[in-house]
Amino acid sequence: MTTNLFRKELEVLKPYVPGKPIEEVQKEYGIDQIEKLASNENPLGPSPKAVEAIMREVQHINIYPDAYAMKLKEEIAKRTNLTHENIITGNGGEQIIQLIAQTFINPGDEAIMADTTFGLYETSVLNMKGVPVILPLKDYKHDLDGFVEKINENTKIIYICNPNNPVGNILSKEEMEGFVARVPENVVIVLDEAYYDYAKVNPEYPESLDVLAKRPNTVILRTFSKVGGIAGVRVGYALTSKEIASQMSKVKDVFNVNILAQAAALGVLEDTEHIEKTVKLNYESLGMMEKYCEENDLEYIKSNANFMFMNIGTHSKPVFEELMKQGIIIRPGFLWKWDNWIRVSTGTLEQTEKFIDKLDGILNKGTCCCG
């Protein structure tokens, strides 16, 4: 095949590796019952009001959706004290991340980010011929001092995932305020708050809308995939200045949020009961995993997301594989070059107990050859 057929940027791009699908594990290992604790999904399932909204709307799928998702934007605006002009909706948070890069990055522009964070930041920047400037975590957190030191005339964006995926911890109000004050106004700060609804119960979690109010060159990213439980229909959104939203709208697909997704997202916004139950269960599941780690002297990162990052003291790959054989799917840390760590999504109490039991059997009873 002709070597110059494809764009040069593709040579450095790596496809995103999602968590293993349940069906694939069932087929590979011949297991019927699988507990998927790999992709940070809602163990309670979708919001019932989202399901009802989809069922009402399904008879209209012959009609194109509202290209502007105006009703959804207006409902989000009410809850954030913004206007619909401050909001961009997308086909999941991933599309918003792509839109950000497409809006801001020129060839040679730099974007600062952590080495252990959501991988699509780097991919989206590379795709636009930008230059990712990648710094290691410091004390398991974004190295904010290092970020500031790396700012130069080519810096266009700084990405902050808060809580950070896959680690799960947060930057505090004090840390965020001190950082934002040192970033020049012409640098765009992207605050990825995919796990916002879990984190906001922590009084130390910063209010990103205050950041946006003080500096317009801020983009806040949120999603309906997590507490809303509608990851399968794909809806995310950005809160930003009217000017930035206007520019982002120029590069988005016309009908980028389908009619069922818009209905589902509106249902989630109304379903406070489902959200409250989800958050409550989340911290109960985290508590069970914390207790196990403490009783077994396993290091873990205090999480304000719907997953835990823990050091199992041995390489994660054989543990990951053995857990799959026993019907549990998690994310092995070697994917992020954290060889001895695993990321485990929160689940129902039964799922969490099953995971703990299987992990304990592997680590303490030699079920796998962990080396």
From Swiss-Prot:
**Reaction equation(s) it catalyzes:** L-histidinol phosphate + 2-oxoglutarate = 3-(imidazol-4-yl)-2-oxopropyl phosphate + L-glutamate
EC number of this enzyme: 2.6.1.9
- Give the keywords, sorted: Amino-acid biosynthesis, Aminotransferase, Histidine biosynthesis, Pyridoxal phosphate, Transferase
- Pathway participation: Amino-acid biosynthesis; L-histidine biosynthesis; L-histidine from 5-phospho-alpha-D-ribose 1-diphosphate: step 7/9
Q: Which residues carry this modification: N6-(pyridoxal phosphate)lysine?
A: K226
Output one GO BP term: L-histidine biosynthetic process
Q: Has keyword Amino-acid biosynthesis?
A: yes
Major enzyme class: transferase
Give the record's subunit note: Homodimer.
Q: Which family does it belong to?
A: Belongs to the class-II pyridoxal-phosphate-dependent aminotransferase family. Histidinol-phosphate aminotransferase subfamily.
Q: Output this protein's name.
A: Histidinol-phosphate aminotransferase
Q: Which gene encodes it?
A: hisC
